[in-house]
Each structure stands twice: as structure tokens, then as C-alpha cells.
Amino acid sequence: MEHYISLLVKSIFIENMALSFFLGMCTFLAVSKKVKTSFGLGVAVVVVLTIAVPVNNLVYTHILKENALVEGVDLSFLNFIAFIGVIAALVQILEMVLDRFFPPLYNALGIFLPLITVNCAIFGGVSFMVTRDYNFAESVVYGFGSGVGWMLAIVALAGIREKMKYSDVPPGLRGLGITFITVGLMALGFMSFSGVQL
């Protein structure tokens, strides 16, 4: 149990997808203008990562891994295609659920919801799961923790950006300039967790 708790804390804070690996930055920067929208997208990313990482673990372990289906057959060259296919299917299901039950959030996320399919934070979580050789339980914890870490980062950035609307930012830094500086400072803050040994 202790191993899973340390993996969860590590994936949320120490190896944060957005602020340590800088994955998923396109939606991270574009949607982080309002806390409510950022939280909605963060929940969507948590759901997709929590489901996509373990499902892709099963696909990799039982189909793609060497000797998984047939002795002597290695289908690992199909990793990227299979993983993206699973992620795309999950995002389509999530999009239908949001459209049916949460129309305001669906409309607020707009084009960024289908872009979760190609969000490199999602694919990065799946790729890290394969390279680190996580088992099914570890992949569930890692997927959930990575999603929560990404959501924490985007909600924090949205909160800061909402406050910055009322501040006197120099004209040359308005817009993305001050946002990049803010993200860099947040990344430095999260980098302080890298010395923590779990």
C-alpha cells in the first residue's frame, strides 16, 4: 500500500505532467483563463488518464508485448497506433457523456475536448507506463495521479490568470508573455519537490 501512495504523490507533485515534463501545454495555456472551465477540463483529463493508462496497460500486456498472443511474435511496433486508438475511443465516449449530461461544460471546452485525444499529457502517461513497466494496479494509480497533477496545475494557473486580469502588467508582457513567466515560476515551485525521496 505504501508503494501505491508514494507512486500517487510522485505522479501528482514530483513528476507533474504539465510542470515537470511540460506535456499538454497547448490546452494548458489556452483553456486556463477561467477556473471553472479549467476545472472541467482537468476533470476530463483525470477521467481519460485514469481509464486510458490501465486499459492501454491491458492492451500492451495481453496483445502487443512480445510473446503475448503467440510465442515469438512481437507486436510492440503497433504501440503508438493502438494507444492512440484507445485514447480516441475514450475521448469520444467522454465527449458524448458531456454533451448529453453537462452541455454548458461541453460548450465551454469547445474544440479543446476533442483535442484531448492528441493531448501529449495523455499519451505521455501511457508511454511512461510502458517504459516504467507498471503493472495494472500501478497503472491505475499512475494514471489517476498524473491526471490530478495536471488538473492541479491548470486550475492553479487559471486562478493566477484570473487575478492577473486586474494587475498592471507591462504592455510587452500582456497575454502569453506573462503566462509563460507564470508557468515557469510554477514549474520552479514544483521542481522543489524533486528532492523528495519516497
Curated annotation (Swiss-Prot):
Keyword entries, A-Z: Cell inner membrane, Cell membrane, Ion transport, Membrane, NAD, Sodium, Sodium transport, Translocase, Transmembrane, Transmembrane helix, Transport, Ubiquinone
Main location: membrane
Protein name: Na(+)-translocating NADH-quinone reductase subunit E
Membrane topology (UniProt): Multi-pass membrane protein
Enzyme class per UniProt: translocase
Family assignment from sequence similarity: Belongs to the NqrDE/RnfAE family.
Stretches that traverse the bilayer: 11-31, 39-59, 77-97, 110-130, 140-160, 176-196
GO cellular component: Gram-negative-bacterium-type cell wall; plasma membrane
UniProt catalytic activity: a ubiquinone + n Na(+)(in) + NADH + H(+) = a ubiquinol + n Na(+)(out) + NAD(+)
Function: NQR complex catalyzes the reduction of ubiquinone-1 to ubiquinol by two successive reactions, coupled with the transport of Na(+) ions from the cytoplasm to the periplasm. NqrA to NqrE are probably involved in the second step, the conversion of ubisemiquinone to ubiquinol.
Protein's GO biological process: respiratory electron transport chain; sodium ion transport
Compartments where located: Cell inner membrane
Organism superkingdom: Bacteria
Protein encoded by which gene: nqrE
Subunit structure: Composed of six subunits; NqrA, NqrB, NqrC, NqrD, NqrE and NqrF.
Bridged cysteine pairs (disulfide): none
EC number(s) from the headed UniProt entry: 7.2.1.1
GO MF: oxidoreductase activity, acting on NAD(P)H, quinone or similar compound as acceptor
Pfam families cross-referenced by the UniProt entry: Rnf-Nqr
